[in-house]
Amino acid sequence: MPDELKPHFANVQAHYDLSDDFFRLFLDPTQTYSCAYFERDDMTLQEAQIAKIDLALGKLGLQPGMTLLDVGCGWGATMMRAVEKYDVNVVGLTLSKNQANHVQQLVANSENLRSKRVLLAGWEQFDEPVDRIVSIGAFEHFGHERYDAFFSLAHRLLPADGVMLLHTITGLHPKEIHERGLPMSFTFARFLKFIVTEIFPGGRLPSIPMVQECASANGFTVTRVQSLQPHYAKTLDLWSAALQANKGQAIALQSEEVYERYMKYLTGCAEMFRIGYIDVNQFTCQK
């Protein structure tokens, strides 16, 4: 990879290394920090998060003994589920020190004999052949200018029959917002600025066509795009309710300012999904 492509460590750590204990106040026990999949209405958040992981992994055609690369592995739930359910070897990449330490503990406590590695590194620093790639909730941090480099690397790492499952929030182009009759308000614009400056520094959302075009330009065929839009609104509602229920602990761990900022982020994003300004999609990319 070109020397100038350095991973965005500072931007990612500014959010994800806030405090594991703080995130545990509103995430489910698997600590999965992405859209859940409520296959049934009566599912708990934990059940729905595992269902989402299974939905993603089920699109990869995993076979025992394969090696799966998890780009942006979070606190390790997808990696460990893949090992347990599909009997594969896993490599996880994260830019968060806290997440890397947590996954190291999961790996150390696992009795499964498959190879399990977590690297405090970005995809820009990875160059080992793998059989399948999954990336859930990381693409939003890459930046538009790196999409081609990412898809090019993924294509190079995968075998001839390789598959990548990319799960990412997607945004509408202003033209699409206008065409759908959605209001373009200063409130919406201000909220977006708040998200990319105070919650996810450097974050940029792709559009669906942007992902499809970059994938195709780098040798992939996008065989399926699945939207989970209503599922993210529900996930965010459950997160904000849990954080609100733990307000005292949240303030003790951080501050009232951080608590209010996160409540604004969680409730505001839920509304953005409900209105339709943003979506979340799983892209199945076949080599």
Curated annotation (Swiss-Prot):
Protein keywords: Cytoplasm, Lipid biosynthesis, Lipid metabolism, Methyltransferase, S-adenosyl-L-methionine, Transferase
Binding site for S-adenosyl-L-methionine: 33-34, 68-76, 94-99, 123-124
InterPro entries cross-referenced by the UniProt entry: CFA/CMAS, CMAS, CMAS_actinobact, SAM-dependent_MTases_sf
GO CC term (a single one): cytoplasm
Top-level class of the enzyme under EC nomenclature: transferase
Active site: C269
Matches recorded under CDD domains: AdoMet_MTases
Domain of life per record: Bacteria
Residue ranges the record marks as coiled coil: none
Database matches in Pfam families: CMAS (PF02353)
Keyword Methyltransferase (UniProt): yes
UniProt-listed Enzyme Commission number(s): 2.1.1.79
GO biological process, one term: lipid biosynthetic process
GO MF terms, alphabetically ordered: cyclopropane-fatty-acyl-phospholipid synthase activity
Localization in the cell: Cytoplasm
Pathway the protein acts in: Lipid metabolism; mycolic acid biosynthesis
The keyword Methyltransferase belongs to this UniProt entry's keyword annotation: yes
Subunit structure: Homodimer.
UniProt record similarity statement: Belongs to the CFA/CMAS family.
Described function: Catalyzes the conversion of a double bond to a cyclopropane ring at the distal position of an alpha mycolic acid via the transfer of a methylene group from S-adenosyl-L-methionine. Cyclopropanated mycolic acids are key factors participating in cell envelope permeability, host immunomodulation and persistence.
Name of this protein: Cyclopropane mycolic acid synthase 1
Native species: Mycobacterium tuberculosis (strain ATCC 25618 / H37Rv)
